[in-house]
Every structure is written in structure tokens, then in C-alpha cells.
Amino acid sequence: MADIRPLERTLRENVTWNRARINFLAKFLVALVQVKTINLVQVSSVMSGLAKPDSHYKRIQRFLRFFHLPFAELARFVIALIGLKPPFVITIDRTDWYLGETPLNVLLLGIASQGISFPLLWTILEKKGCSDTAERITLIEDYLRLFGRQSIEFICADREFIGVDWLAFLCREGIAFRLRLKENLLVENSRRRKRVAARNLFRTHRAGVGVLLAGPRQVLGQSLFVMGMRRSDGEYVIIVSSEESEQMLTDYARRWGIETLFGCLKTRGFCLEATHVTDKERLRKLLALMVLAFCWAYRTGQWLTQADPLKIKKHGRLAKSIFRHGFDHLRRILCNQDCLLERIAFIRLCKLLSCT
């Protein structure tokens, strides 16, 4: 069983929670990494201490129910811990699943960096399906209150995040963006006299080659720049931007970092879909705990690769992701605390959760 005191010391230096909350956080993070699932029954079954699993489970429930978690402090902690520097590429997307017939729907904002997105802010949508404009604007406004407009390089998001009011908000706030259009959305043609389906503007161009249309075009009431590409499978990737740039398609590709993040939180990491928590605020807090564990694993991976870089395969990708590399190492150390060398290694890993 891990001695959590080194982890408690590190957490006290970096968060403003009281001693009891820090003790709980340390126990929860260690247990979460050990069991590789956010299922609270399994987490409580391995939490350190003399209490029975039922007592640990009730303690988790009390934390989720009563603790007013400082989400703004957590967002700043993530940025400082990973060492992210503005201006940021902001990604926004949604992930959903079902618990029986109950839809669980998370709208999340993160910072794209190093091929992944680091989660900062999120909200739980009490419905199934897409987010609406008001929900997106609220999330962006929460971000702006914390970090300001000047901290944003641009926002990138998929086809769900298109709409008249949404584009008007981004343009009004002076926030740059790279957003993907649905290929049947109407866009001005080259003569500016007629609106046609966006795909028709790229139908005759060679597959796999990005084309930036000349001049801004009217898109949902805004004058925007449009770049697109016809893929070899016949699908179109069409991006609109508030700025003219030959890099629009490349910029938009950074959106995939948030898909990688969702994979880490779900099947490749902490099995988010295994939770039975459905209450909006409790699920939001549970995600916060998972984000801390995710960042710890990622920092561990960064630290490991400084001394021993990951191999690159023939296709140009890493043999293992930095997150997975760190997560596997962290779990091995935490699951073998009977060994003196592993206890010493755990003390070193605890220091990786420090921003100083």
C-alpha cells in the first residue's frame, strides 16, 4: 500500500484545499491510477487507510456532494503544471455516452499542445445530442474571465460548432477561429452573386490538395475566409476562418488533440464511461479528479521521455503516446509499493505534480 504522505506534501504546495481534502485527493488519485477506472466501487476498494471500502465509498460521495471545488484554480494549475504558454490554440468538443437510458453529455474546452488537448473547463449537458449556442458561449465566457481574449491564438472545432449566433459572437469578441463547415452549407460563389453548397466550390479541384478561395465569402451572415479539400474517399474538409491563412487546414487538424484526450479519459485510460454518477455537479467534480490524474500521468510521460525518448515507428508516429507511457509507469510504481526502490520512485513521481 502506497504511503501517500509525499503526495500530500506536494499537493499542499500547489492547491489551497484544507488538510482533510488534500488527504482525500491523494488517496483518490493513487487509487484511480491503480484500478484504471473511474468506477467508484473499484476506486474505494483500494484506497489506502484503515477504513473499510464502504467508508471510503461514502467519503467519495460526500466529497462529490458537498465540496465546492475551485474549478478556476484547477484550470490555472493545469496550465502551470504542463508548462503551457499563451497564446493558446483552444479546442472545444463534446463527448457523450449512456448509462442505461440516461444520457451523459460533456462539453469540454481544452488547450491543444504536443498532439493532445489539455482540459481546462467543462460543463455537463443535461440532454442528449448537440450543444446549443448559449452553452458554448457560456463556456467561452468562463474562459475569457480567467485568461482574457489575448490568450487565444484561435479556436478550432468540428461541424457541430457552426451557427449564425455562434459565429456572430466569435466575430464580435474578436476571437480567431478555424471551424469546419458541413459540406452542404451555403457559401457565396466566386462572383458573389449566388450561394452554393460549400462542396461545389471544391468539386473540380484535385483530391488531397487544399485550396484557399480568393477573398472573403459570406457564411451565415459573416464575411469569412474559406479553405477546403476534397479527400480521396469523396468527403470534403471545408474550413472557415476569421483570418486569411494558407495554414487553415493544418491549423484545424490540431482539433484532433481533443479526440486523443477523450480516448485517454475513456478506453485508453480511466474508463470514464464506467461511472455511475449522473448528477450534473457531481460528475463535473469527478471529471476534475480525473483531469488531475491525467495530468500526473502525462507529466510522468514527459519526464521519462527526457531521459529515454520514445521510439518513432516507420509510419512516423510514436510507438506509444506520452500519456500511455507515463500512465503505465505510474501504475507499475503504485502497484508495487512493497519494494523499497519503487517507494523511492514514488517520491520522485509525486514531485511531478508540483508547479514550482
What are these regions (language model features)?
Residues 1-37, 46-49, 67, 74-75, ...:
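Single, function-defining residue in the core of a domain
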Residues 40:
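Helix-turn-helix DNA-binding elements, focusing on the entry/boundary residues of the two helices
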Residues 53-66:
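Major-groove recognition helix of helix-turn-helix-like DNA-binding domains
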Residues 78-80:
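Short, compositionally biased leader-like segments
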Residues 93-106:
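An active-site-proximal beta-strand-loop segment
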